[in-house]
């Protein structure tokens, strides 16, 4: 996933990068279904909820806030979600 907010070019760009892939999970080892995103005791449980979906959501919300508030950027802000970190198959070009 890629999105870019353009700045005026007076500063270098910044990349907000996260990975979207997850490691395999054995449902027998989980107290909730690993793909459920279940909320238990005020915490979201599920594959990727900590590594790295949370960071991706924070980055997306940052990008949206910058856009909605019409912040005048000195450099581009690039939002990048990759899909090869867990597999160590670094072929996404990032």
Give short role names for the model-derived ranges.
Residues 1-47, 66-73:
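Acidic/His- and Gly-rich active-site-bordering loop/insert found
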Residues 50-94:
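Acidic/histidine-rich catalytic neighborhood of metal-dependent amide-processing enzymes
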């Amino acid at each position: 996933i890629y999105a870019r907010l353009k700045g005026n070019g007076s500063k270098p760009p910044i990349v907000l990068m996260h990975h979207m892939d997850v490691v395999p999970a054995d449902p027998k080892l989980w107290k909730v279904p690993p793909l459920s995103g279940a909320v238990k005791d005020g915490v979201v449980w599920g594959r990727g909820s900590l590594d790295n979906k949370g960071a991706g959501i924070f980055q997306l919300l940052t990008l949206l806030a910058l856009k909605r508030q019409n912040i005048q950027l000195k450099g581009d802000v690039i939002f990048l979600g990759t899909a090869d970190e867990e597999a160590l198959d670094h072929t996404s070009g990032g």
